[in-house]
UniProtKB/Swiss-Prot annotation:
Chain location of the short sequence motif NPA 1 per the record: 74-76
GO cellular component terms, semicolon-separated: membrane
Keywords: Membrane, Repeat, Transmembrane, Transmembrane helix, Transport
Organism of derivation: Oryza sativa subsp. japonica (Rice)
Protein name: Aquaporin SIP1-1
Main location: membrane
Tissue expression remark: Expressed in roots, leaves and anthers.
Function: Aquaporins facilitate the transport of water and small neutral solutes across cell membranes.
Organism superkingdom: Eukaryota
UniProt key word Isomerase: no
Motif, NPA 2: chain positions: 192-194
Any Pfam family matching the protein: MIP
């Protein structure tokens, strides 16, 4: 069990490193694509490009996570699937989670530091990660609500949504972009404590109460509440009784 937990944590660290490295380029990639296509008017065109790029990224990372045995780049996703009773048996205990959360945070730090060095100078102003733009409690409430909504959407799309993986990925991308736009004036937003911690570390804000309260406690509360709501509406099937041996 300990070996499997360490392997899962290592896979999470690697995937989170790559996720933060790649997803941080979405703004620059959208700007580059719209410039290449000479699309300078209408924000809806830029949003379409962003959703398309995010869909490709999510599809690729879903394949990568599956290949690594269920790796994840978002601590709230692990907590939500655990609370909803949807975790696999080997990932359902608390010990693996206790290893995977800090591993994801460490991977995010590495990804944020790497992209800060690799990003071309003309696009570096697009980096920086989520940051609080309102008072502390308003930001905390916003992060809780946003994480609740995205978690509920993710659970429904993955468990009860369409079977086609491309359609699922497109729906996840649209949901994510809509909530990012909604929360932009509040917290950034993050909806992913590891990603928020990575950028907070780069900007030397990782050891503050704001980081812990707004970007860790409240997203976890929102994710677990969403999981409980999902479990109440869509209860998992009862385990089949084992056949007694004659």
């Amino acid at each position: 069990m300990a070996v499997a937990a360490v392997r899962a944590a290592a896979a999470d660290a690697a995937v989170t490193f790559l996720w933060v490295l790649c997803v941080s380029t979405l703004g620059a990639s959208t700007a580059a694509v719209t410039s290449y296509l000479r699309i300078h008017e209408g924000i809806h065109y830029a949003l379409l490009v962003t959703v398309s790029l995010l869909s490709v990224l999510l599809f690729a990372f879903n394949l990568l996570c599956d290949a690594l045995g269920g790796a994840s780049f978002n601590p709230t996703a692990l907590a939500a699937f655990h609370a909803a009773g949807l975790s696999s048996p080997r990932h359902s205990s608390l010990f693996p989670l206790a290893l995977r959360f800090p591993a994801q945070a460490a991977g995010a730090v590495g990804g944020a530091m790497a992209i800060s060095e690799l990003m071309p100078e003309q696009y570096k102003h697009m980096l920086g990660g989520p940051s609080l733009k309102v008072d502390l409690h308003t930001g905390a409430a916003a992060e809780l609500v946003l994480t609740f909504v995205i978690t509920l959407a993710v659970l429904w799309i993955i468990v009860k949504g369409p079977r086609n993986p491309i359609v699922k990925t497109w729906m996840l991308s649209i949901s994510t972009v809509c909530l990012v736009l909604t929360g932009a004036a509040y917290t950034g937003p993050s909806m992913n404590p590891a990603n928020a911690f990575g950028w907070a570390y780069v900007n030397n804000r990782h050891n503050t109460w704001e980081q812990f309260y707004v970007y860790w406690i409240c997203p976890f509360v929102g994710a677990v509440l969403a999981a409980w709501v999902f479990r109440a509406v869509f209860p998992p099937p009862a385990p089949k009784p084992k056949a007694k041996k004659a």
